[in-house]
């Protein structure tokens, strides 16, 4: 198996994570958005908007699990940052929460589901997209036949 190939099991595992996001996160966030009354706290509004978008776009991951890998990476990174910046101080102060446990489980699930060999091959080793229409120094010549 090449570094760009992903096992069928891993594809189904990724689809399971996307499905969890779509169904569980969506069923929690969307009703809260539609039933909310009054003005939102701006920071809380950003968080709910982000989670709503994450749940919605996760639906695409069911059909295109590899194309949506950046979504899983984003999810992993935001949860890891939350655990380090907010969760760790809570645990240090012996004030653990259900949210901290959910974030920790989410990080573990993301680390297991993400096809790391594919990520390295696609986003680290493979050359990036060009920045210009034409590479610097490249010239096009018209051949006269």
PLM feature spans:
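Membrane-water interface at the C-terminal end of transmembrane alpha helices
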Residues: 108-135
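Short, amphipathic, aromatic/basic-enriched membrane-interface segments that mark the entry/exit
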Residues: 36-45, 70-73
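Short, Lys/Arg-rich, polar N-terminal cytosolic tail immediately upstream
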Residues: 1-8, 144
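Membrane-helix interface segments
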Residues: 64-68, 99-100
